[in-house]
Amino acid sequence: MRVVIGADKEGMELKNMIKCYLLENNFEVIDKSEEASEDFVESTVAITKDVLENKGSLGIAFDGYGAGSFMVATKIKGIIAAEVSDERSAYMTREHNNSSIITIGSKIVGSELALNIVKEFLEASYDGGRHQIRVDMLNKMA
């Protein structure tokens, strides 16, 4: 699976920890911020563009609180994103909402929780069915 990641200065340490996990577990990792982006807007826009251009890719944006990257991602047409700080939400946003990007705040979750969030997000798959109506509504909005 192809996973696109990126971070601003506040999310860099957590991003690098998750990157190591992804590489160790044979994910294809595209790091859009080998060096920290000056602002979460830059890193999140880079992630969203890549995810849109590469069907089937998933993205993870890291910043201080997750909210900034979330706001940016949801402004991009074709992107469904969720700010998550727990494992269940990470899983369900893929399964029911077909989210292609999650945002994680490094000042909100620690490294162990972040790792579990990423695992759940990447293990989940979209159910479709009755949830497609919601996804279609979201895609019409942005």
Curated annotation (Swiss-Prot):
BP-aspect Gene Ontology terms: D-allose catabolic process; galactose catabolic process; lactose catabolic process via tagatose-6-phosphate; pentose-phosphate shunt, non-oxidative branch
- Pfam families associated with the record: LacAB_rpiB
What Gene Ontology molecular-function terms does this entry list? galactose-6-phosphate isomerase activity; ribose-5-phosphate isomerase activity
Broad EC category: isomerase
Catalytic reactions on record: aldehydo-D-galactose 6-phosphate = keto-D-tagatose 6-phosphate
Do you know which Gene3D superfamilies this protein is assigned to? Sugar-phosphate isomerase, RpiB/LacA/LacB
Give the Enzyme Commission number.
5.3.1.26
Q: Which UniProt keywords apply?
A: Isomerase, Lactose metabolism
Kindly tell me the pathway this chain contributes to: Carbohydrate metabolism; D-galactose 6-phosphate degradation; D-tagatose 6-phosphate from D-galactose 6-phosphate: step 1/1
Quaternary structure? Heteromultimeric protein consisting of LacA and LacB.
Q: Which family does it belong to?
A: Belongs to the LacAB/RpiB family.
Protein name (database record): Galactose-6-phosphate isomerase subunit LacA
Q: Which organism is it from?
A: Clostridium perfringens (strain 13 / Type A)
* Gene for this chain: lacA
